[in-house]
Amino acid sequence: MDELAHQVARFLEFLATQRSASPHTIAAYRNDLNGFSSFVRSERGNTVSTKTVDHLLLRLYLASLNGGLDKQQRAGYAKSSIGRKLAAVRAFFGWLVRTRQLEVNPAELIATPKREQRLPFHLNIDQTVTLIEAPGHTGQEQPTFARDTAILELLYSSGLRVSELTGLAVADLDRAAGMVRVQGKGGKERIVPVGSAALEALEQYLAGRGQLADDAPLFLGCRGARINRRTVAQLVKRWASGIPAFRSISPHTLRHTFATHMLEGGADLRSIQELLGHSSLSTTQKYTHVGLDRLLEVYDKAHPRARETDQQNGESA
């Protein structure tokens, strides 16, 4: 193992032990830093050190992510992927500087490409109801149908990340209070309300599981173990196939739908930020949006001059 690989391993250990990063986050960092390390070795040889990485090498790395200097090479990564990979490299060298193993972060001045501001897809209310009620409209009864309904209800009711949902234990759900305790990113705990429809679905699902220990997983996979992210994604995609004008829908779609419907219902951004577990309000601002028609409706109802103009027009007609 060369010095670069050794330091990458130490950085990943730091993320796990000191920052309480999730396994998913650590895996993403590992993948991005291993890709960077492979590029460095291809340019500087198999035995490389963090001290051999300079601004020029990082510029070459950025060019490779964009598809290479040769225009005949493959198409590059999306801007969002390039930004994530550069952020991983910048964080890695920043850690080396903070731990006094390097004097300067060579990635600090590498500009991150601006991401396209695409609005995430969300469901309207009718589509949401169609999705959530789909398992109950099959005309069949299977144990997984009650589980799937409970999962769909909870994702939409509380805006959970899929990793938060799969990590839930029975004791995390307070059915009497209508609350659920969630372990979010970085091990941060928050308490989130659970709506009555979701509670009812959870009651029906748990009633079929008998006596449960507090530390038992709240949701099980088909083999009786804790449900995983992939299974949740598959069941969401399966039941979403019945939605008119179907498109790719993931568990995260329900999280965004939750935030959008909360905002449209009058919730303020700070409250939505707390419910989603965002550390920064700017993340919530990017995450939520209101359609133009909804904005115009709110404006017409709320702005004094808008109402006054309508009244004047009505009187003159």
Swiss-Prot record:
Highest taxon in the source lineage: Bacteria
GO MF entries: DNA binding; tyrosine-based site-specific recombinase activity
InterPro entries to which the protein is assigned, alphabetical: CB, DNA_brk_join_enz, Integrase-like_cat_sf, Integrase_catalytic, Integrase_recombinase_N, Integrase_SAM-like_N, Tyrosine_recombinase_XerC/XerD, Tyrosine_recombinase_XerCD
Subcellular location: Cytoplasm
Active-site residues (renumbered): 161, 185, 252, 255, 278, 287
The Core-binding (CB) domain, residue ranges: 2-97
Alphabetical UniProt keywords: Cell cycle, Cell division, Chromosome partition, Cytoplasm, DNA integration, DNA recombination, DNA-binding
Function: Site-specific tyrosine recombinase, which acts by catalyzing the cutting and rejoining of the recombining DNA molecules. The XerC-XerD complex is essential to convert dimers of the bacterial chromosome into monomers to permit their segregation at cell division. It also contributes to the segregational stability of plasmids.
Subunit structure: Forms a cyclic heterotetrameric complex composed of two molecules of XerC and two molecules of XerD.
UniProt-recorded name of the protein: Tyrosine recombinase XerC
Lineage, highest ranks first: Bacteria, Pseudomonadati, Thermodesulfobacteriota, Desulfuromonadia, Geobacterales
